[in-house]
């Protein structure tokens, strides 16, 4: 993630509008070489008779590494060249994407397709075009969907696809190898007490850790969820009853309050670029993040930053009391709104992006920034060419999701969007609330969405 997050990039990729003489049904055009390391079945694509005069408007999250946008733009331009359908793509800052999605959904106007956040489709399901035809085709062709992709793409406990996960963003531990060794560790411990000791020692040697406890869409929610799950706590139980009022949540809050003492000051104000900047500046030695930090350092012309990349390692977040390392991968989730005049063109655009000639290079060049929702893409060679990418490979092969361990619903989305859990941790860590009072506040807010038991 980079300092360019607040910059809104807009690119209109031209192409002649479809003529009035008639619009063909588009098949599976392969305008780029198909990657040879993506296993695929011979499956006939669904046929979408594209609407006359179709033109699309799309919004998606702003990039944190250049290839994410560069290859998205290349693929979009290729789609226009192949089909004649012009597509306008707007790249929206992470903080603004949810509000803009809400406006589009509530006004019934604006972008045809929103590549939005993980569970937001559950808020707007009645306003979305179903995706079963696309999901079934892609799943059959590319080895099936990872379970977490199915959870985010389908109505809870049904086979109805309301959205299509495009790629998951995960946040494993990112750390400086030499500084962690200086603190007495060869790797990041899974035991929470040992992890606390490591962070304390990093602070003592002048290289503190740093985790966002502010309103950072990805980083803060990811850290707060880890803190809950690693201590055996959860927002709701499997039946969807709010379960925050527990001894496990108290333990999680006390743990983060102690950990906060060893963090660099100011993490309460960090957005999703805060830890990136601090790490690249050499101000912190450990954080949780996507691959963007490593990617920027590795590809910098600055020898100092290149040396930092060599001294950087990734590892799954500490397991603590969880069944396995409690890391999720929140996907960028494609939503096609019913107000679109060109739903078939929109579906064809999404299908085109997910096919191997387009998706393979985009995924590989993003270098772990996004993790694949379709199993065949996990076979691509780039995942094993750099061992430092290992924690990002198969990141969507996880049991953890927003709202774990309950149903994924509009309530789960609202809790995340309103930073209910993040604010609970922040209040205790900064000394503005006791664990018990912070839990009461969080429970009241969560019950506004989930209802009372």
Spans of model-derived segments:
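Hinge/lid segment of periplasmic solute-binding proteins
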Residues: 32-50, 117-172, 196, 309-315
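N-terminal secretory signal peptides and thylakoid transit peptides that target proteins
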Residues: 1-18
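Glycine-centered hinge/linker elements that transmit conformational signals in sensory
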Residues: 198-205, 239-268, 313, 317
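Extracytoplasmic/periplasmic solute-binding protein
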Residues: 153-166, 171, 196-242, 248, ...
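Short, solvent-exposed loop/beta-turn-alpha elements that line the ligand-binding surface or hinge
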Residues: 46-51, 132-148, 231-252, 299-312, ...
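C-terminal lobe and pocket-closing loops
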Residues: 41-43, 48-50, 119, 292-308, ...
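Conserved C-terminal helix/tail region of periplasmic/extracytoplasmic solute-binding proteins
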Residues: 33-38, 42, 50-51, 86-87, ...
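Extracytoplasmic "Venus flytrap"/periplasmic binding protein-like
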Residues: 74-146, 178-190, 278, 282-286, ...
């Amino acid at each position: 993630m980079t300092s360019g997050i607040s910059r809104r990039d807009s690119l209109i990729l031209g192409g002649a509008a479809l003529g009035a003489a008639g619009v063909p049904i588009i098949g599976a055009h392969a305008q780029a070489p198909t990657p040879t390391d993506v296993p695929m079945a011979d499956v006939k694509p669904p046929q979408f008779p594209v609407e006359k005069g179709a033109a699309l408007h799309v919004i998606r999250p702003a990039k944190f590494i250049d290839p994410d946008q560069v290859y998205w733009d290349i693929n979009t331009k290729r789609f226009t060249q192949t089909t004649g359908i012009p597509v306008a793509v707007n790249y929206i800052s992470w903080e603004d994407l949810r509000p803009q999605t809400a406006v589009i959904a509530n006004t019934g106007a604006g972008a045809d397709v929103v590549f939005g956040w993980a569970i937001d489709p559950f808020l707007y399901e009645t306003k979305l075009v179903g995706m079963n035809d696309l999901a079934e085709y892609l799943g059959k062709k590319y080895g099936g969907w990872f379970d977490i992709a199915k959870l985010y793409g389908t109505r809870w406990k049904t086979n109805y696809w309301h959205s299509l996960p495009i790629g998951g963003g995960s946040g494993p531990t990112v750390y400086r190898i030499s500084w962690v060794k200086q603190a007495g560790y060869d790797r990041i411990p899974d035991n929470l007490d040992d992890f606390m000791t490591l962070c304390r020692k990093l602070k003592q040697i002048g290289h503190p850790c740093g985790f966002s406890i502010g309103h950072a869409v990805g980083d803060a929610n990811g850290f707060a969820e880890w803190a809950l799950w690693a201590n055996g706590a959860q927002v709701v139980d499997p039946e969807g009853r709010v379960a925050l009022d527990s001894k496990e949540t108290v333990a999680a809050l006390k743990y983060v309050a102690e950990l906060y003492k060893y963090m660099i000051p100011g993490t309460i104000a960090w957005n999703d670029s805060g830890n990136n900047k601090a790490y690249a500046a050499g101000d912190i030695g450990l954080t949780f993040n996507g691959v963007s930090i490593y990617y920027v350092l590795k590809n910098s012309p600055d020898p100092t930053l290149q040396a930092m990349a060599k001294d950087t390692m990734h590892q799954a977040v500490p397991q603590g009391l969880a069944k396995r390392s409690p890391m999720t991968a929140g996907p960028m989730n494609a939503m096609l709104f019913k107000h679109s005049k060109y739903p078939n063109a929109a579906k064809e655009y999404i299908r085109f992006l997910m096919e191997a000639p387009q998706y393979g290079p985009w995924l590989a060049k993003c270098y772990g920034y996004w993790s694949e929702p379709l199993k065949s893409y996990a076979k691509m060679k780039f995942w094993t060419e750099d061992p430092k990418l290992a924690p990002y490979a198969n990141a969507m092969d996880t049991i953890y999701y927003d709202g774990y361990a309950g149903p994924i619903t509009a309530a789960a989305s609202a809790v995340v969007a309103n930073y209910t859990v993040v604010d609970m941790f922040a209040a205790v860590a900064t000394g503005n609330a006791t664990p018990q009072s912070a839990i009461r506040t969080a429970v009241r807010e969560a019950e506004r969405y989930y209802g009372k038991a």
